[in-house]
Amino acid sequence: EVDPIRHTLHISEESFSWMEEILDAWSEDGKPIFAVSHYLFENTAPLSFDSEIIINSNTIGEQDQQLRELLADYENVFYFCGHLHASFGVIEPYQVVVEDGGSFWEINLSSLKASARGYLPVPSTWLLYVYEDEMVLRARDFASGKWLTQFDQVLELSVN
């Protein structure tokens, strides 16, 4: 039963098959692959495991492991999500590792409308710069026009 306040993600088997076909095609050149969804994976952010209130229903849900395994089969996958309305200083990019040894990056984006935790002024988020061997996330407060270098992140790419 789905919590009426907090929801989860559902992906049909047809969509999983489509995603696998797309990932197969896009992974051939070794360039980064960006996947975007509203929900984060379980136990990847402080609010999904470091809370008095269990809020795993704020996450992908029952298909968590299936989606993890699919994304981890490919190099240079970056999964962008949100939902928590948490900003810089609370959630950093998280490397999701599966038992078989594959991994990908989960990047939880700030809310552009209202931030409940962390750096509160909105709109603020990361600007993404992709280079041959790394991806740079530069934090910016768009209301003030200031760069927030203390929250910048650099993620290495697998180079074939």
Walk through the language-model features, giving the residues of each.
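Binuclear metal-dependent phosphoesterase catalytic core
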Residues: A86-N160
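Short amphipathic alpha-helical segments and helix-helix/interface helices
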Residues: L23, D64-L71, Y94-V97, T125
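Short, isolated positions within intrinsically disordered regulatory regions of eukaryotic proteins
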Residues: E20-I22, G30, V130, F151
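Active-site environment of divalent metal-dependent phosphoester hydrolases
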Residues: V2-I5, Y39-P46, N76-Y94, A114-A116, ...
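Divalent metal-coordination and catalytic microenvironments
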Residues: M19, A35, H83, L128
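Solvent-exposed, well-ordered amphipathic alpha-helical segments
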Residues: E20-S27, G101-S103
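Short beta-strand segments
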Residues: F34-H38, F80-G82, I107-N108, A139
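Active-site-proximal segments of metal-dependent phosphoesterases and phosphodiesterases across multiple
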Residues: D3-S17, W26-F78
